[in-house]
Amino acid sequence: MEAVVNSDVFLTSNTGLKSSYTNQTLSLVDEDHIHTSDKSLSCSVCNSLSQIVDDDFISAGARNQRTKPKRAGNDQAQQTTKKDCMVSIDEVASTHDWSTRLRNDGNAIAKYLTTNKYDTSNFTIQDMLNIMNKLNIVRTNRNELFQLLTHVKSTLNNASVSVKCTHPLVLIHSRASPRIGDQLKELDKIYSPSNHHILLSTTRFQSMHFTDMSSSQDLSFIYRKPETNYYIHPILMALFGIKLPALENAYVHGDTYSLIQQLYEFRRVKSYNYMLLVNRLTEDNPIVITGVSDLISTEIQRANMHTMIRKAIMNIRMGIFYCNDDDAVDPHLMKIIHTGCSQVMTDEEQILASILSIVGFRPTLVSVARPINGISYDMKLQAAPYIVVNPMKMITTSDSPISINSKDIYSMAFDGNSGRVVFAPPNIGYGRCSGVTHIDSLGTNVMGSAVHSPVIVNGAMMFYVERRQNKNMFGGECYTGFRSLIDDTPIDVSPEIMLNGIMYRLKSAVCYKLGDQFFDCGSSDIFLKGHYTILFTENGPWMYDPLSVFNPGARNARLMRALKNQYKKLSMDSDDGFYEWLNGDGSVFAASKQQMLMNHVANFDDDLLTMEEAMSMISRHCCILIYAQDYDQYISARHITELF
């Protein structure tokens, strides 16, 4: 019965067709400065471009390739910068036939809306399905529901599927200023066509043969070189150490630099950039980067960060976990300001939100109660990059813990104070928190009652768990020496979630490092010492703990874990006789393994965990949880009818 209620709530939720996107806080383009590859103390964009020039991604024999730019027309209509001007998405996203047919269906729905003078302010998914039935539009792929909705969502005052001309990609497409062309010409000199093409081809080829870190090119992983101090952040490992549906398409197959180039020179994008373009054109809020004062420079810096993350993905999947100071992407991610969130973010939420915002990735569509005029409430569809879980605002007991499972997954609410979607099961007392709106399935505002919030997920679903007890008082402990206190309230995390008839498995988790995770996991230490990641690979849970190479005690713990894993292989998973083996036949193996770890090299098998160990760590220390479909099942396409 609950599934029926959830379906009804979703179908009748307001889709919010009119776009609220506005990007009027920054100027269009810097008229006095063209970004080059020369290092500058006053321009962070030039500094990041200089790192791209100095960086040799991959050595390969390839001739320099030159793209032939299309001549810019003299049509004055293209030079408009009116804030209320609209441009058709169909003009921007001209790709192959498969996407053209999808957009034609979206245009037909939009035309039907305007011809019949529908009130778009109250438009629902049920209305769209009814119109599809009348127009004989049959769409069986479940992902096409997302795509059709994004096309129709931007319909405002006419039959064209539109976005505002304040969006930077539309300004690039319309050549709103001659300085845009000057800047992109300079970029063509900086981005070596050969090197960039090789980087794209390599990461895409890797993606074809990569499942998780157990299928890495080299199972002997290098954590550090003597001259390096930076490492791949555990959040990057959680997102790209396992192939996640939808995110892989946006980050590995899509490319922000080539997207900008194609929009300006050819006024259309190629098929591999199509989903990246749709994600970007339908984002709700722009991002602002500290030290960057105009829209075009922001897009250039976004392209630079996409390229830096792409290189990190390539290294992750080759088993290279260290990086030079210039290659570290974390400092750039920390400079992004998220205009849609009014609350101070912790370091880990900032990094997660920044990585996803670079490609506009918001895989979760939730029907939540939103306040109207401060006196009433309406159910609206809200796209979210991740769901926030705050244990410190939840009242729990041993009999009623915080549970993330198939039953409670429909308990979502909108936090008006921060602008985020939060996980709010009915038993945790969230109703007393300011800004959080609860509404029951009958439409009556009932604070603290069970929430019925239907959820549709495009491939992956992410949770961010707020465990820092004083995140609004202090920040930047990396630079000040201040250590956060961590709330280690246990969470009942289900390894599998059944959502709308589709199985989503726990693929990875980022956890707070409070002590050494082998000897001290049962200690009462509550001070943050860093992060580590647990990936659920085909060979079992695997831990990525980059900070272990900097601490002798942690290295000894890793050595003990590696020796135990080796002994279990030899003794058929038995622990009996381990120390006798270590003092006898295993002494040679122990000496060689110790030498490997001293050289900051480890094999994949060294850091395997049991399922019980992994789930115990995740329960008390997790800060990010990532659920996803199996990649092959996601690709094989499902029906829209299975969503309800």
Swiss-Prot record:
GO terms for cellular component: virion component. Residues 1-61 form a propeptide. Its main location: virion. The 73-kDa precursor is cleaved to a mature protein of 60 kDa during virion maturation. Proteolytic cleavage of major core proteins OPG129, OPG136, and OPG098, which occurs at a late stage of core formation, is required for production of infectious mature virions (MV). Disulfide bonds: none annotated. Residues 61-80 are annotated as: Disordered. Major component of the virion core that undergoes proteolytic processing during the immature virion (IV) to mature virion (MV) transition. Essential for the formation of a structurally normal core. This is Major core protein OPG129.
